[in-house]
Amino acid sequence: EQVDIHPCRLAQTPSPNVPLYLPAMGAYTAYLAAYFKQQGADPYELPHLTDDILSLGRAETSAKEYLPFPALLGSILAERKNDHAHAQFLIPQTQGAEADGQYARVIRAVLDRRKEQNAQLISPMLETLPEMAQNCDALFRALLAGDILYAAPADKRADISAQWDALPGWEQLHTAAREIGALLTKGRRIAAVGTPLCLTELDSGVLAALEAEGEQVLRAPLSEALWFLWKDNLDENKPSAGWLDQM
Protein backbone atom coordinates (compact mmCIF):
# COMPACT_ATOMS: atom_id res chain seq x y z
CA GLU A 1 0.00 0.00 0.00
CA GLN A 2 1.27 3.43 -0.92
CA VAL A 3 1.84 5.61 2.12
CA ASP A 4 2.05 9.37 1.73
CA ILE A 5 5.07 10.90 3.43
CA HIS A 6 4.59 14.40 4.80
CA PRO A 7 7.95 16.04 5.52
CA CYS A 8 8.11 18.25 8.60
CA ARG A 9 10.24 21.30 7.93
CA LEU A 10 11.19 23.14 11.09
CA ALA A 11 13.45 26.18 11.09
CA GLN A 12 16.32 26.37 13.59
CA THR A 13 16.63 30.15 13.85
CA PRO A 14 14.00 32.91 13.65
CA SER A 15 13.65 35.34 10.78
CA PRO A 16 14.03 39.06 11.53
CA ASN A 17 11.09 41.47 11.33
CA VAL A 18 8.53 38.69 11.92
CA PRO A 19 6.88 38.40 15.36
CA LEU A 20 8.43 35.59 17.41
CA TYR A 21 6.24 34.22 20.20
CA LEU A 22 7.99 32.61 23.18
CA PRO A 23 6.36 30.18 25.63
CA ALA A 24 5.39 31.81 28.91
CA MET A 25 8.09 30.60 31.32
CA GLY A 26 7.99 32.93 34.30
CA ALA A 27 11.19 34.82 35.03
CA TYR A 28 13.01 33.32 32.05
CA THR A 29 10.77 34.81 29.36
CA ALA A 30 11.85 38.45 29.69
CA TYR A 31 15.54 37.56 29.40
CA LEU A 32 15.01 35.16 26.51
CA ALA A 33 13.04 37.93 24.79
CA ALA A 34 15.97 40.32 25.36
CA TYR A 35 18.34 37.73 23.90
CA PHE A 36 16.27 37.27 20.76
CA LYS A 37 15.83 41.03 20.41
CA GLN A 38 19.62 41.42 20.42
CA GLN A 39 19.76 38.90 17.57
CA GLY A 40 17.34 40.97 15.47
CA ALA A 41 14.11 39.11 16.24
CA ASP A 42 10.79 40.67 17.28
CA PRO A 43 9.88 38.70 20.45
CA TYR A 44 6.55 38.48 22.27
CA GLU A 45 5.21 36.25 25.03
CA LEU A 46 2.49 33.69 24.34
CA PRO A 47 -0.69 34.00 26.44
CA HIS A 48 -0.57 32.60 29.95
CA LEU A 49 -2.48 29.40 30.55
CA THR A 50 -6.23 29.66 31.12
CA ASP A 51 -9.02 27.09 31.11
CA ASP A 52 -10.03 28.25 27.61
CA ILE A 53 -6.48 27.89 26.29
CA LEU A 54 -6.16 24.42 27.81
CA SER A 55 -9.48 23.43 26.22
CA LEU A 56 -8.22 24.58 22.81
CA GLY A 57 -5.17 22.36 23.16
CA ARG A 58 -7.02 19.33 24.48
CA ALA A 59 -9.56 19.53 21.66
CA GLU A 60 -6.72 18.59 19.29
CA THR A 61 -5.48 15.59 21.29
CA SER A 62 -6.86 12.07 21.42
CA ALA A 63 -4.98 10.83 24.47
CA LYS A 64 -4.15 12.00 27.98
CA GLU A 65 -1.09 14.03 27.07
CA TYR A 66 1.10 15.57 29.75
CA LEU A 67 -0.03 19.11 30.54
CA PRO A 68 2.82 20.98 28.74
CA PHE A 69 1.69 19.75 25.31
CA PRO A 70 -1.96 20.91 25.32
CA ALA A 71 -0.84 24.07 27.13
CA LEU A 72 1.68 24.94 24.40
CA LEU A 73 -0.64 23.97 21.58
CA GLY A 74 -3.56 25.83 23.12
CA SER A 75 -1.55 29.02 23.61
CA ILE A 76 -0.48 28.97 19.95
CA LEU A 77 -4.05 28.33 18.76
CA ALA A 78 -5.33 31.13 21.01
CA GLU A 79 -2.84 33.55 19.49
CA ARG A 80 -3.83 32.47 15.98
CA LYS A 81 -7.48 33.16 16.77
CA ASN A 82 -6.56 36.78 17.44
CA ASP A 83 -4.16 37.30 14.54
CA HIS A 84 -3.67 35.33 11.31
CA ALA A 85 -0.67 37.37 10.15
CA HIS A 86 2.72 35.77 9.55
CA ALA A 87 4.21 34.81 12.93
CA GLN A 88 6.85 32.52 14.41
CA PHE A 89 6.54 30.34 17.50
CA LEU A 90 9.49 29.00 19.50
CA ILE A 91 9.08 25.30 20.31
CA PRO A 92 12.47 23.65 20.98
CA GLN A 93 12.93 19.97 20.17
CA THR A 94 15.38 17.23 21.13
CA GLN A 95 17.07 14.39 19.30
CA GLY A 96 15.62 11.74 21.60
CA ALA A 97 12.34 9.86 21.35
CA GLU A 98 10.83 11.31 24.53
CA ALA A 99 7.43 12.91 24.03
CA ASP A 100 8.38 16.49 24.93
CA GLY A 101 11.08 16.43 22.27
CA GLN A 102 8.47 15.77 19.58
CA TYR A 103 5.99 18.53 20.44
CA ALA A 104 7.08 20.70 17.51
CA ARG A 105 6.35 18.02 14.92
CA VAL A 106 2.88 17.31 16.28
CA ILE A 107 2.02 20.99 16.61
CA ARG A 108 3.19 21.52 13.03
CA ALA A 109 0.83 18.75 11.89
CA VAL A 110 -2.08 20.35 13.75
CA LEU A 111 -1.33 23.77 12.24
CA ASP A 112 -1.08 22.27 8.75
CA ARG A 113 -4.42 20.54 9.16
CA ARG A 114 -5.94 23.86 10.21
CA LYS A 115 -4.40 25.59 7.16
CA GLU A 116 -2.24 27.82 9.37
CA GLN A 117 0.52 28.24 6.82
CA ASN A 118 1.42 31.69 8.16
CA ALA A 119 2.37 30.14 11.51
CA GLN A 120 6.01 29.06 11.40
CA LEU A 121 7.61 26.97 14.12
CA ILE A 122 11.16 27.74 15.20
CA SER A 123 12.48 24.51 16.67
CA PRO A 124 16.16 24.57 17.58
CA MET A 125 17.64 21.25 18.62
CA LEU A 126 18.52 21.60 22.30
CA GLU A 127 21.49 19.25 22.10
CA THR A 128 23.20 21.35 19.41
CA LEU A 129 22.39 24.84 20.69
CA PRO A 130 26.07 25.67 21.40
CA GLU A 131 26.77 25.15 17.69
CA MET A 132 23.58 26.71 16.31
CA ALA A 133 22.86 29.63 18.67
CA GLN A 134 23.59 33.08 17.26
CA ASN A 135 25.28 34.12 20.54
CA CYS A 136 25.99 31.30 23.01
CA ASP A 137 27.26 33.61 25.72
CA ALA A 138 24.17 35.84 25.65
CA LEU A 139 21.83 32.83 25.57
CA PHE A 140 23.47 31.30 28.63
CA ARG A 141 23.25 34.62 30.49
CA ALA A 142 19.52 34.76 29.70
CA LEU A 143 18.99 31.30 31.20
CA LEU A 144 21.21 32.04 34.20
CA ALA A 145 19.37 35.30 34.89
CA GLY A 146 16.13 33.39 35.39
CA ASP A 147 17.85 30.82 37.60
CA ILE A 148 19.43 33.51 39.79
CA LEU A 149 16.12 35.34 40.23
CA TYR A 150 14.39 32.13 41.29
CA ALA A 151 17.21 31.48 43.77
CA ALA A 152 16.37 34.78 45.50
CA PRO A 153 13.54 35.20 48.00
CA ALA A 154 10.33 36.05 46.17
CA ASP A 155 10.08 39.50 47.78
CA LYS A 156 13.61 40.43 46.59
CA ARG A 157 13.28 39.47 42.91
CA ALA A 158 11.76 42.70 41.62
CA ASP A 159 14.50 44.80 43.25
CA ILE A 160 17.24 42.56 41.86
CA SER A 161 15.90 42.55 38.30
CA ALA A 162 15.41 46.34 38.42
CA GLN A 163 19.19 46.74 38.84
CA TRP A 164 19.94 44.69 35.72
CA ASP A 165 20.12 45.56 32.07
CA ALA A 166 17.45 44.02 29.83
CA LEU A 167 19.92 41.17 29.37
CA PRO A 168 22.30 41.31 32.37
CA GLY A 169 26.03 41.01 31.88
CA TRP A 170 28.31 38.67 33.78
CA GLU A 171 29.27 41.26 36.40
CA GLN A 172 25.62 41.94 37.23
CA LEU A 173 24.91 38.21 37.48
CA HIS A 174 27.96 37.58 39.68
CA THR A 175 27.02 40.45 42.00
CA ALA A 176 23.44 39.23 42.34
CA ALA A 177 24.55 35.64 43.00
CA ARG A 178 26.91 36.80 45.77
CA GLU A 179 24.24 38.96 47.39
CA ILE A 180 21.62 36.22 47.25
CA GLY A 181 24.05 33.70 48.70
CA ALA A 182 24.69 35.99 51.67
CA LEU A 183 21.01 36.46 52.52
CA LEU A 184 19.65 34.83 55.65
CA THR A 185 16.94 32.35 54.74
CA LYS A 186 13.98 31.10 56.71
CA GLY A 187 11.44 28.35 56.34
CA ARG A 188 11.93 24.88 54.93
CA ARG A 189 14.09 24.27 51.89
CA ILE A 190 11.86 22.53 49.32
CA ALA A 191 13.40 21.18 46.11
CA ALA A 192 11.18 21.47 43.03
CA VAL A 193 12.03 19.43 39.93
CA GLY A 194 10.23 19.09 36.61
CA THR A 195 10.07 20.58 33.15
CA PRO A 196 10.65 24.35 32.81
CA LEU A 197 6.96 24.93 32.06
CA CYS A 198 5.86 22.93 35.10
CA LEU A 199 8.22 24.88 37.38
CA THR A 200 7.06 28.28 36.13
CA GLU A 201 3.60 28.38 34.53
CA LEU A 202 1.88 25.04 35.02
CA ASP A 203 2.12 24.55 38.78
CA SER A 204 -1.29 26.14 39.50
CA GLY A 205 0.43 28.68 41.74
CA VAL A 206 1.54 26.02 44.24
CA LEU A 207 5.20 27.10 44.33
CA ALA A 208 4.33 30.78 44.67
CA ALA A 209 1.92 29.92 47.49
CA LEU A 210 4.66 28.02 49.33
CA GLU A 211 6.99 31.00 48.96
CA ALA A 212 4.28 33.34 50.24
CA GLU A 213 4.05 31.15 53.34
CA GLY A 214 7.77 31.65 53.99
CA GLU A 215 9.12 28.43 52.53
CA GLN A 216 12.26 28.46 50.37
CA VAL A 217 11.51 26.76 47.04
CA LEU A 218 14.64 25.62 45.20
CA ARG A 219 13.72 25.16 41.55
CA ALA A 220 15.92 22.94 39.38
CA PRO A 221 18.14 25.40 37.43
CA LEU A 222 17.43 25.46 33.69
CA SER A 223 20.93 26.64 32.81
CA GLU A 224 22.48 23.72 34.71
CA ALA A 225 20.19 21.16 33.05
CA LEU A 226 21.05 22.44 29.58
CA TRP A 227 24.76 22.66 30.38
CA PHE A 228 24.80 18.96 31.31
CA LEU A 229 22.82 18.13 28.16
CA TRP A 230 25.36 20.04 26.04
CA LYS A 231 28.29 18.47 27.88
CA ASP A 232 26.90 14.97 27.26
CA ASN A 233 26.60 15.75 23.54
CA LEU A 234 29.90 17.59 23.27
CA ASP A 235 32.01 17.20 20.14
CA GLU A 236 35.57 18.09 21.15
CA ASN A 237 36.33 19.02 17.54
CA LYS A 238 33.67 21.76 17.40
CA PRO A 239 34.47 25.39 18.28
CA SER A 240 31.70 25.30 20.89
CA ALA A 241 33.75 22.85 22.99
CA GLY A 242 35.96 25.66 24.26
CA TRP A 243 32.93 27.75 25.22
CA LEU A 244 31.43 24.87 27.17
CA ASP A 245 34.69 24.35 29.06
CA GLN A 246 34.67 28.05 29.95
CA MET A 247 31.12 27.81 31.27
What do these predicted regions represent?
Residues 1-247:
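An N-terminal assembly and electron-transfer interface module characteristic of large anaerobic redox
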